[in-house]
């Protein structure tokens, strides 16, 4: 599966548009990650606990999008975009959303 944020694939020809594909996931840090992340917020520096949660969420959302594209018979996804938002309150989670256009290329 070829993935790109560009609208085209250079010399590769798009021969069929399959449609919009999406991936969404909400991740919350574990208790340990929450405690370590909270301490890091107090003392400053890179917050690897929360960074890892965000990276994992992005990978899972992307894989969900890829799975949808494969089900449609696509072999590439173009115009990929990512978005995220923080869920406050008692969940303290991060929502990661990605989307793109599933296509067949030659």
Swiss-Prot record:
PANTHER family in the record, alphabetically? Answer: UPF0145 PROTEIN SCO3412, UPF0145 PROTEIN YBJQ
UniProt protein name: UPF0145 protein Fphi_1781
Query: Superkingdom of this entry's organism?
Result: Bacteria
InterPro entries per record: UPF0145_dom_sf (IPR035439), UPF0145_YbjQ-like (IPR002765)
Give the SUPFAM superfamilies listed for this entry: YbjQ-like
Q: Which Pfam families match?
A: YbjQ_1
**Native organism:** Francisella philomiragia subsp. philomiragia (strain ATCC 25017 / CCUG 19701 / FSC 153 / O#319-036)
Family assignment?
Belongs to the UPF0145 family.
Alphabetical list of HAMAP family matching this protein:
UPF0145
